[in-house]
Amino acid sequence: MFEYRETLGINFDPSHLIWQGMDPVAALRELKGAVYHFHAKDTKVDPYNKAKNGVLDTGSYGDLLDRSWVFRTVGYGSDTALWKDMMSTLRMIGYEGSVSIEHEDGLMSVKQGLEKAIRFLQDVMITEQPAQMWWA
């Protein structure tokens, strides 16, 4: 997709792709070898407000009821299947770096958002190396 050096890589934040209607899994596949950091942050898109305002909503981030989309704690915007697909794809593209929780959820305290994000990610992250494929 583009030329890059070993010292230059992507800080992948799926939340921005989600509000734009893009597929973060497809983006991860395209960026194989260029992802150097991963942010665990989610977005909830409100279909009614999106139909009215579009995705380039310039309203206040504090206007949670009327915005087309809002940042959410992981698991409160997108379903578990998307997060499992992202974690699996990170493994397939060879990413072995950190998963950094970024809390920008206007509905939860930082403490509660962090606690919920940790619990959610514990279920979807792949932390052990796979066994040899004896069936292949």
Predicted regions and their residues:
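A general structural detector for well-ordered alpha-helical segments in enzyme core domains, enriched
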Residues: 1, 27, 82-89, 116-121
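A short, acidic, flexible beta-alpha connecting loop/helix-capping segment that sits on the rim
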Residues: 100-109
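Residue-level marker of alpha-helix boundaries and capping positions
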Residues: 76-77, 108
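Conserved, mostly hydrophobic/aromatic
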Residues: 13, 38, 90, 99, ...
